[in-house]
């Protein structure tokens, strides 16, 4: 009995790749208005000026992104890992808004400390939830193994410490193991603006971040990859890649990875999501999509 091959194997075995791909094309005019895969971002109740590359900037993504602020959830409260019942309800409302009202494919956040609420966020939606790039650690560890190390860059390594047990439980990763190196950027000139909500000066901060990366690698030459935990670090990822030659993973890479699960291969996709996106983003500013009474309570002009 002859062996019957399907998929790409079948194409290579005798059907002819070109003909196979032609048959895989969706019918003309199938649905020109089909919705592109999109990202939902749960935002802190604070105002800062995101750089291109930051999760808070829609220009960081090549697909639609929608934002929803959580009234009352300040940076300090998020960092503590404890929400009041009122803020918890607002958190739930934000996720359900992104899921049901905007129909996003994946939900993430604009602060790495949202990892405190990874488990809770999953209760409110069936969509993939990745509150922090730390969720990538298990895959990175599996890919690199125990012979290499992963450097985890954060805004402040000291304030990240209390989240150790939550990360261990949610990600199955113990960053106290020798294969992880925690790196705080709190001493990088200009990066203190993150804590105060002030705009980051890209030209001022970039040399310090790159210098920090080189220093850490010099001290730990067996580092094989870098993970940016803070959502305001991705604007510097390209410079760190260029300076170190190492792969750098961050919140943008994390979002891209999970979005790709909803996007067909552009060579032979079936659902038209591979059609070019027109680049339109929903306009967003702090205070959008919240009730007037919440604006009065939590948003200052």
UniProtKB/Swiss-Prot annotation:
Keywords: Lyase. Mediates cleavage of dimethylsulfoniopropionate (DMSP) into dimethyl sulfide (DMS) and acrylate. DMS is the principal form by which sulfur is transported from oceans to the atmosphere and is a key component of the ocean sulfur cycle. The gene is ALMA1. The active site is at residues 111, 230. Induction: Expressed at low level. At least 10 million metric tons of volatile dimethyl sulfide (DMS) are released into the atmosphere annually by the dimethylsulfoniopropionate lyase in oceans. It is a component of the tangy aroma of the seaside and functions as a chemical attractant that guides various marine animals, such as sea birds, invertebrates, and some mammals, toward potential food supplies. DMS oxidation products act as condensation nuclei, causing water molecules to coalesce, with possible effects on local climate through enhanced cloud formation. The keyword Lyase applies. Homotetramer. Gene3D superfamilies: 3.40.50.1860. It is an enzyme of class 4 (lyase). It comes from the Eukaryota. It catalyses: S,S-dimethyl-beta-propiothetin = acrylate + dimethyl sulfide + H(+). GO terms for molecular function: dimethylpropiothetin dethiomethylase activity; racemase and epimerase activity, acting on amino acids and derivatives. This is Dimethylsulfoniopropionate lyase. Belongs to the aspartate/glutamate racemases family. ALMA1 subfamily. Its EC number is 4.4.1.3. InterPro entries: Asp/Glu_race.
């Amino acid at each position: 009995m002859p062996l019957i091959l399907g998929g790409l194997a079948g194409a290579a075995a005798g059907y002819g790749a070109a003909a196979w791909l032609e048959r895989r094309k969706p019918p003309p005019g199938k649905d020109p208005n089909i919705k592109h895969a999109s990202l939902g971002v749960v935002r802190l109740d604070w105002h800062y000026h995101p750089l291109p590359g930051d999760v808070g900037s829609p220009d960081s993504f090549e697909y639609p992104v929608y934002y929803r602020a959580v009234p009352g959830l300040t940076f300090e409260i998020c960092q503590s890992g404890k929400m009041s019942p009122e803020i918890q309800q607002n958190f739930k409302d934000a996720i359900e808004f992104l899921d049901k009202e905007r129909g996003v494919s994946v939900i993430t956040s604009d602060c790495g400390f949202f990892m405190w609420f990874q488990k809770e966020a999953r209760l409110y939606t069936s969509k993939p939830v990745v509150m922090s790039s730390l969720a990538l650690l298990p895959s990175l560890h599996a890919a690199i193994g125990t012979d290499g190390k992963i450097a985890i860059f954060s805004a402040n390594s000291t304030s990240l410490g209390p989240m150790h047990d939550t990360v261990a439980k949610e990600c199955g990763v113990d960053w106290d193991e020798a294969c992880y190196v925690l790196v705080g950027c709190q001493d990088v000139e200009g990066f203190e603006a993150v804590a105060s909500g002030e705009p980051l000066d890209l030209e001022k901060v970039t040399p310090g971040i790159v210098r920090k990366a080189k220093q850490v690698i010099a001290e730990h030459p067996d580092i094989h990859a870098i993970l940016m935990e803070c959502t305001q670090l991705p604007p510097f990822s390209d410079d760190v890649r260029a300076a170190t030659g190492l792969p750098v993973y961050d919140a943008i890479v994390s979002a891209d990875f999970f979005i790709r699960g909803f996007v067909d291969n552009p060579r032979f996709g079936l659902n038209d999501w591979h059609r070019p996106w027109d680049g339109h983003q929903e306009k967003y500013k702090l205070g959008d999509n919240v009730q007037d009474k919440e604006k009065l309570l939590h948003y200052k002009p």
